[in-house]
Swiss-Prot record:
Cofactor details (free text): Binds 1 zinc ion per subunit.
Pfam families: HGTP_anticodon, tRNA-synt_2b, tRNA_SAD
Gene responsible for this protein: thrS
Matches recorded under PROSITE patterns: AA_TRNA_LIGASE_II (PS50862), TGS (PS51880)
Cellular component aspect of the GO annotation: cytoplasm
Location in or out of the cell: Cytoplasm
Reported cofactor(s): Zn(2+)
Protein name (Swiss-Prot/TrEMBL): Threonine--tRNA ligase
GO biological process, one term: threonyl-tRNA aminoacylation
InterPro entries per record: aa-tRNA-synt_IIb, aa-tRNA-synth_II, aa-tRNA-synth_II/BPL/LPL, Anticodon-bd, Anticodon-bd_dom_sf, TGS, Thr-tRNA-ligase_IIa, Thr/Ala-tRNA-synth_IIc_edit
């Protein structure tokens, strides 16, 4: 046997090793049970891959991003095998790994039931214990079609080899190169147990799957298109250990408690009636209070920062979106046109920026007016497929806190710095404090403007972001075609990351709208345009805060800041007078004068997550005082009336949590 020289790469360490022909990647890492694959020359390979002379080989740990994807993809195969053993008529769709888990689509006569999922999970456990070996083999297109003749969706994937999309998961099955099938082989006999069209890589055996659980099933269109058949999708999750699986399930349970759709109903904040339509919310009185307070505070802070408020209509002639380019770039996200005025197309607006450009262009502008900061709570409408609409976080009609800033090239860096600082400070005011920034840069295949302008703008954004002292994560190629952007990513109380604010440079719209201002020398010059959405949308930010606080808003945002709870009927009037005085100070106070017993009233207030429960009995009336009960059950007694009102007002004014 001839010698083979390979380089073992581990982080920054490189080790040259001489092995014999036929050595596999697994042979390079004996006893390392957490290694599930290898990266060879930058490509992921199974551990069964035979290394070649001169190759660089890096172990892939199961806990790494690639390792988790391999674990979850292999578990998806086990699930598909289990489904076809239990439901032989089931036809296979696609089964990719996704964030924190995996799914597989099936064409079956009836939707899966909860009992079916339990049976499938039990069968998966049996397959896992069998230790079946994942074995890769290369096949021709013709051979693949012959082997998979009974799988119509696999045949379709073979036909699109080379153009498979990452968006619909097809690229996990077929790529631009050779076709491969993965066989699940019996650990003892080597007999074929099951097979699937797949690019891989996979775990060595099913025994390498430490912990998994099936989560739910849902309907899904084949490859995400409503024109295609409806399939049944089963979601699952898989982790490197049982402890990590348990931690994930605990996290999901906590997230479910905080689900804004659930809390919105329990706290009577908003609803999404079927009679109106998916993705179109109505805010109830209590939710309306929270939203108004959010908007009022934002409006005040914007005024302090020199923004000017504007209002624009909800619909416009289609010609405006031809000028802006939205009909070229964004038509699929817009609602269909309405033909009015003798056949003129009108559209519901998906964005506010074209109308703000018309405001800028309504008269001549001088450099002395710049920066011009236009701001609007502008309601927009975007067509989202029903499968992606999700409560308030992915809606079809929503209100953006939308600003567009027009400034000179010389003032661009200063304005970006001020804008980002303002954005972060305002988010902190609402209680979000854990951030990192993401810098989205040019997609070399899709951009307008010169390379020089992009480089200057990107470097300016980078410097502005670095000044904040926050982690800066690159997003290569992630920018829109019209300019680079900074995204503010915020973590909530349970560690989830939400994209909040964006600060986006735009080289496209000033050109399309021929926007100009008169410079100091009298010449006409093109302004720099900055898009800035701080909340993203009011509805989405409302949902994020609702989940962040688990419905227990700080007093300044709470729809009811204090509720009076009389110990008996004789104390109702006393608390009503207290409430009247508190309302004069601008506080939102109610008195529970129902016939419920006091303990029931306290439970009701706790369920509604009211910050202050103000309790009064005979002793309180005699002393001219009240008692405070807080959300955590603690209590403070004998607080004089004026002091009690002042204390609530102070907590509201300082925007602190109690």
């Amino acid at each position: 046997m001839s010698d083979v020289r390979v380089i073992i790469q581990r982080d920054s360490e490189r080790e040259e090793r001489v092995v014999t022909t036929g050595t596999t990647a697994a042979d390079l890492f004996p006893g390392e049970r957490t290694v599930v694959a290898a990266r060879v020359g930058g490509e992921l390979k199974d551990l069964a891959y035979e290394v070649k002379d001169g190759e660089e080989v890096e172990p892939v740990q199961i806990s790494s991003e690639d390792g988790l994807n391999i674990l979850r993809h292999s578990t998806a195969h086990v699930m598909a095998q289990a489904v076809q053993e239990l439901f032989p008529e089931a036809k296979l769709g696609i089964g990719p790994p996704v964030k924190d888990g995996f799914y597989y689509d099936f064409d079956v006569a009836k939707p899966f039931t909860p009992e079916d999922l339990k049976a499938i999970e039990k069968k998966m456990q049996e397959i896992q214990k069998r230790g079946q070996r994942f074995s890769r083999r290369v096949v021709t297109d013709e051979a693949a079609r012959e082997e998979l003749a009974d799988e119509p969706y696999k045949l379709e994937l073979i036909g699109i080899k080379g153009s498979a999309s990452n968006d619909d998961g097809a690229n996990v099955e077929v790529g631009s190169g050779e076709l491969t099938i993965y066989d699940n082989l019996d650990a003892k006999t080597g007999d074929l147990c099951w097979k699937d069209l797949c690019r891989g890589p996979h775990l060595p055996t099913t025994r390498n799957i430490p912990a998994f659980k099936l989560m739910r099933n849902a309907a899904a269109y084949w490859r995400g298109s409503e024109k295609n058949p409806m399939l049944q999708r089963i979601y699952g999750t898989a982790w490197p250990s049982k402890d990590e699986l348990k931690a994930h399930l605990d996290f999901l349970a906590e997230a479910e408690k905080r689900d804004h759709r659930k809390l919105g109903n329990e706290l009577d904040l908003f609803s999404i009636p079927d009679q109106i339509g998916s993705g179109l919310a109505v805010f109830h009185p209590k939710g309306g209070i929270v939203r108004r307070v959010m908007e009022d505070y934002s409006r005040r802070r914007h005024e302090e920062e020199g923004y000017e408020f504007v209002y624009t209509p909800h619909a416009t002639k289609g010609k405006l979106f031809e000028t802006s380019g939205h009909l070229d770039w964004y038509a699929d996200g817009m609602y269909p046109p309405m033909q009015l005025d003798e056949g003129v197309d009108y559209y519901l607006k998906p964005m506010n920026c074209p109308m703000h450009n018309l405001i800028f262009d309504a008269r001549g502008r001088s450099y002395r007016e710049l920066p011009l900061r236009l701001f609007e709570f502008g309601t927009v409408y975007r067509y989202e497929k029903s499968g992606v609409v999700h409560g308030l976080t992915r809606a079809r009609g929503f209100t953006q806190d939308d600003a567009h800033i027009y400034c000179t090239r010389e003032k661009m860096a200063d304005e970006l710095d001020k804008t980002l600082t303002f954005v972060l400070n305002l988010l902190r005011d609402y209680g979000l404090t854990d951030f990192y920034l993401e810098l989205s840069t040019k997609d070399p295949e899709k951009f307008v403007g010169s390379d020089e302008v992009w480089e200057e703008a990107t470097e300016t954004l980078r410097q502005v972001a670095e000044k904040q002292g926050l982690p800066l994560v690159p997003d290569p190629g992630g920018a829109a075609f019209y300019g680079p952007k900074i995204s503010v990513q915020a973590k909530d109380a349970i560690g989830r990351t939400w994209q909040m604010s964006t600060v986006q440079l735009d080289f496209n719209l000033p050109e399309r709208f021929d926007l100009e201002y008169t410079g100091p020398d009298g010449s006409k010059q093109r302004p720099v345009m900055i898009h800035r959405a701080l909340f993203g949308s009011i509805e989405r930010f409302f949902a994020v805060l609702l989940e962040h606080y688990a419905g227990a808003f700080p007093a300044w945002l709470a729809p009811v800041q204090a509720v009076g709870i009389p110990i008996g009927d004789a104390h109702v009037e006393y608390l009503q007078k207290f409430a009247a005085e508190a309302k004069k100070k601008g506080l939102r106070v109610e008195v529970d004068s129902s016939s419920d017993r006091m303990q029931k009233k306290i439970r009701n207030a706790q369920k509604q997550k009211v910050p202050f429960m103000v309790i009064a009995g005979d002793e309180d009336m005699t002393a001219g005082a009240v008692s405070f009960r807080y959300r955590d059950g603690s209590q403070e007694n004998g607080i004089p009336l004026d002091e009690a009102i002042a204390k609530i007002a102070k907590v509201v004014e300082e925007r602190t949590q109690v």
